[in-house]
Amino acid sequence: MELTRRQAIRTGLLGAAGLAAGGTLTACGGGSSSGGSAAAMTLWYWSGGLSPSVVTDATKKFASQTKLTSSVIGGDFKQKLLTTMTSRRYVPDITGIKGEDMPAMLPDADRFVDLNTLGAAKLKSQYLSWKWAQGMTTDGKLIGFPIDIGPTAMFYRSDLFAQAGLPTDPTTVAAQMKTWDEYFAAGVELHKAIPKTYLVDNAGDIFTAVVGQSGSRFIDSSGKFVGDQDHIRTAWDTAVKTVTLGIDAKINDNSWNGNIANGTVGSVIGAAWHALDIEQAAPALSGKWRVAATPDGPSDNGGSFLAIPTTCPDPALAFQIITWILNPTNQARGFTDEALFPSTPASYTMSALTSGDKYFGGQKTIEVFGPAAQNIPNQYVAPADSAVSAPYYNQLINVENGTSSDSAWSAAVSQAKQIFAQQGGS
């Protein structure tokens, strides 16, 4: 069974600690072999990473200049890319890089073309500034060109909210559940009225959202571990409240789809791309889900980039292909085809985004996601962020299984510090 994007990100976070000691590229000299040539180019991405129809059109558009061959790579995309780049064989000329993997790629920026040398700066104003910064090194090299972003929102079952006597209109829901405490209070009422239904799918998703709302993560820009400081503890305590209040469904496995479909989960805090996951999990619930603003403000979860390895025989042409695939019009198509929320604000006024979404009762979800996208805090994400954050998610599962919050917190911080040290932190 193919993992949804939310499952893939969760799996990556929970497994990151085990890979903490060996996740970077090894440096090597010239003489690399590439899967492409001046007459042919290869593009790697993962299922759902780009609009297939846009990629097909790119193949046709640039047919007079190159034979563009695209490959949808299954399994562990990052590891397969690292393996081919290290072996210097069959390296793609254009490759996707997942947002959660970009921080680990930035220290090896010399393995990718600096897109600024190809004129990327002239296009910067068309893309969200915080997203643009995520693909840039501290010394100003741009290795990742923005694909999509993951502005968060509250997805909720309007029919279950109505049954519990809660508001159902997205504007009213946002106004009455503008803080986490107000949202959780509504969850208590929901579970009281419908005992089989819980407000959230798991505590980890709440932790992710609250960390994303703060100005800092687990390692600051000076390289200092800050995973034991107040902003992380606040996110932890907020997530744990869902457990202590009895409004957490504690779903951390592949039963997520079934629990979305059977009404166990009454709402989900997730990125824009969760819309497709929910629709695929529960097509029969079309018209019953709605979207409202995230309590206490937006955050980002997911989103990816395209990059050009230095082995590419014609970086200038590769860049032309990338910028065409990711222009505002084609990003709007990506939203229609794959629920890839555009990193280009100009797309937000296009019909692909302004039309009502049938699955969400005809709601114009851009009215929620658009403002969220433009108000996401800019955070520094260290190369070791995924590995260092993994213990917090593992320990939150332990809290869901009965471990005390304080005990699990201490274990999470201790384990995170150990991983930080293994990654070269001090």
What are these regions (language model features)?
Residues 98-153, 290, 358, 370-371:
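Hinge/lid segment of periplasmic solute-binding proteins
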Residues 361-416:
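C-terminal capping/gating helix-and-loop segments adjacent to ligand/active sites or protein-protein/ligand interfaces
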Residues 72-81, 100, 176-182, 249-262:
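Short helix-initiation/N-cap motifs at beta->coil->alpha
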Residues 184-188, 222-253:
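Glycine-centered hinge/linker elements that transmit conformational signals in sensory
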Residues 101-106, 272-285:
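A ligand-binding cleft/hinge motif common to bilobed small-molecule-binding domains
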Residues 93-96, 266-271:
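Paired acidic/hydrophobic, glycine-rich loop segments that form the ligand-binding mouth/hinge
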Residues 64, 241, 247, 281-342, ...:
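Extracytoplasmic/periplasmic substrate-recognition and gating elements
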Residues 2-104, 123, 316-317, 329, ...:
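Conserved N-terminal structural module of periplasmic/extracytoplasmic solute-binding proteins
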